Regions:
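C-terminal output helix
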Residues: 90, 108-117
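Acidic catalytic/metal-coordinating carboxylates
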Residues: 4, 35, 61-64
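Short amphipathic alpha-helix used as the core "switch/output" element in two-component signaling
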Residues: 41, 63-76
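CheY-like receiver
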Residues: 122-156
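Active-site beta3 strand of CheY-like receiver
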Residues: 47-53, 57
Length: 156
């Protein structure tokens, strides 16, 4: 299984710990960014599986970056987790409206974030496996498997 690439953006010490955990304990390849504009530039250049963005990123907020990511045509759309100081209902609604896949309020438990990310990683792994299976099947076999045999042929 390939290493997932995670883009992490935030300046607080919690993000330093998060980057270290993502590299050392969770086994991800980590891209570090300092602001929302850097996040957008990195996503234009590189395939990223997961974006973990602080709501309060400088130059472009995590919310604005999330909206940009969903509006721009990228090769693949990453799974986006927005993190914020306050988990007010209007912030949660704004995050999901901007295209976030998940939302966590700070202070958050690293285990909660790891659960979100590892669940997504498992889904990616299953999709990769299904994709490999489908690419190795004979197209006629797919046709035969998915379509019922016509009645005229079933009597033969």
């Amino acid at each position: 299984m390939r290493k997932l690439k995670v883009l992490i953006g935030g300046a607080e010490s919690v993000f330093c710990d998060l980057r270290k955990a993502a590299r050392e304990f969770w086994g991800f390849e980590v891209l570090e960014i300092a602001d929302g504009k850097q996040a957008c530039a990195a996503l234009r250049k590189e395939h990223v599986d997961i974006c973990i963005l602080d709501w309060d990123l400088p130059r472009m907020t995590g919310l604005a970056a999330c909206h940009w990511i969903r509006c721009v045509e990228l090769k693949t759309q990453p799974y986006i987790v927005l993190l914020t100081e306050k988990g007010r209902p209007e912030q949660v609604q704004a995050a999901y409206a901007a295209g976030a896949d998940d939302f966590l309020a700070k202070p958050f438990n690293a285990e909660d974030l790891h659960f979100l990310v590892s669940t997504f990683a498992q889904k990616i792994s299953r999709l990769d496996l299904t994709s490999r299976e489908l690419t190795h099947l004979d197209p006629l076999e797919l046709y035969r498997r998915d379509l019922p045999a016509p009645k005229i042929f079933s009597r033969l």
